[in-house]
Amino acid sequence: MPLTGKQRRQLRALGHHLEPVVIVGQSGVTEGVVAAVEQALHDHELIKVKIHEGPEDRHEAAEKLSQGTPAELVQLLGRTALLFKKRAEDSEFDKL
């Protein structure tokens, strides 16, 4: 289910103080990066991903990450993407 504008705004505010937990390197979005993002989303629900120079531009890399994982792209600001996937149970974001 897509996020509403209000939900995106709340997630952006919560994600402001987060540090990137996954870094996309020179190889771009690979299977290993997608697996790392999925694991981080399982652990944290809301994550930042740092996108360095690579074969794709930052918009393409962020889209690949959101399509390759069950995550929603909340924001792309510069080279940092904010991704969100709500857990089915035990979610910290039940009030969204």
Give the predicted meaning of each segment:
Residues 1-96:
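Positively charged, polar, low-complexity stretches
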